[in-house]
Amino acid sequence: MKGTFDVSRWETWFQLKERGTTWTTEILAGCTTFMTMVFILVVNPAILSDAGMDFNGVYVATVLVTLISTLIIALFGNFPFVIAPGMGINAFFAYSVVKAQGIPWQTALGSVFLAGTVFLVLALTRYRRFLLDAIPQSLKYAITAGTGLFICFVGLQNAKLVISSPDTLVTLGNLREPGTLLSIIGLAVTLLLMTYRIRGALFLGMIVTSVLAWIMGLMQLPSHFLSIPSGLAHTALQLDIDGVFNYDMLAVTFTFLLISVFETTGTMVSLAEQAGLMKEGRFPHSRSALLANAVGVTSGALLGTSPITTLVESGSGIAAGGRTGLTPIVTCILLVITMFFAPVAETLASTPFVTAPALVIVGFSMLEEMVHVEWKSFEEAFPSFLVMVTMPLTYSVSSAIGIGFIVYVLLKLFRGKAKEVHPALYFFALFFFIQLGFIHS
């Protein structure tokens, strides 16, 4: 078959034979990945609209940045990975930065853009190793686990399973309240689907919960199910970069950078191992993969969404046999179709009780990183513990990271192990000490 679509040429480009896969397998794998990650198209705009952003604008931005980043890593890296806005870091953006600190979402986008620009420089140079090596492994895992606790806490609040209390700060909500009861049922349904390993359990769980919400009178059906993509003008190029250059926002920017680099690097290595793409313990073509993520972070800020990351949900497509960039390309084709279903997505997201179960489960899934913390080493374990526990309790990911850095350095000094601390970590700890102790309000 010659012409624009030459099958043999594409088979050679994607190395189908070398990686022991076929067109059929790659297509099925792409569909599988789509089913497991499509919930993000609902949850990400739902979270960011809580911060005052336009839902439709974020929805279109989410799809576009996913397409841009994923096509780069698929075509130039030939990896079966999908890149999209990350769960957890979007909650940090909306609830910790914008709502808790009162920072305009436009300034938060400016912070994301600055973090993405630095990420891009790191991806193009060898300095990315400098940043990765500076942060202790235990703290890296603690940051991911703490973010999971944070997003789980947000989910419990949205479900009103946890509510504020003047006596105990928080308390158990009224389980007989219709919305709370709906979230409990939705969580149970989703867990049932996951128990039976149903692909797309999170998304299907939201669909079932939405139907129940409509039956209970908690949700109105959209007047139409399809629409021309719109709203991007409300979020694209709205970022405020000038407002980023103060101590508090630089701490936020540093946090965006850390989480983006750590999550991206860790997830890609894990997925590459699952797909059998590691060569002698090395991750081949890592630069192109990192560039795709860095470009995604910066373009996401320009379009109007929180930082992106390589999705762990890509593992479902790999488990289905996906081994090349064809897998995410199939996912991208399906994503283009979903762009026209914004009214349906907005309806699903309009009731926080519907998306709450997904947040709780996503948060839980991030806790598996806790097992990698060196719990038998006090100076490694205690700072990690503080990072995890202070994230949800302070509603601030950046403050929790700063506390972890400071305590880690102090404990190493107390133990006479100053040489074990990377020189850059001393600078990071001092930066957060000044920010938290003298500037943060």
From Swiss-Prot:
UniProt protein name: Nucleobase transporter PlAzg1
Function (record text): Transports adenine, hypoxanthine, xanthine and uracil. Transport is probably proton-dependent.
Record InterPro entries: Azg-like, Azg-like_bact_archaea, NCS2
Organism listed in the record: Paenibacillus larvae subsp. larvae (strain NRRL B-3650 / LMG 16245)
Principal localisation: membrane
Keyword Membrane listed: yes
One of the record's GO molecular function terms: purine nucleobase transmembrane transporter activity
Source lineage: Bacteria, Bacillati, Bacillota, Bacilli, Bacillales
Superkingdom per UniProt: Bacteria
Keyword terms: Cell membrane, Membrane, Transmembrane, Transmembrane helix, Transport
Topology with respect to the bilayer: Multi-pass membrane protein
GO-annotated cellular components: plasma membrane
Pfam families: Xan_ur_permease
Localization per Swiss-Prot or TrEMBL: Cell membrane
Family, similarity comment: Belongs to the nucleobase:cation symporter-2 (NCS2) (TC 2.A.40) family. Azg-like subfamily.
Activity regulation info: Inhibited by the proton gradient disruptor carbonyl cyanide m-chlorophenylhydrazone (CCCP), but not by the sodium gradient disruptor ouabain.
Positions of transmembrane segments: 27-47, 63-83, 103-123, 143-163, 178-198, 201-221, 249-269, 289-309, 325-345, 347-367, 391-411, 421-441
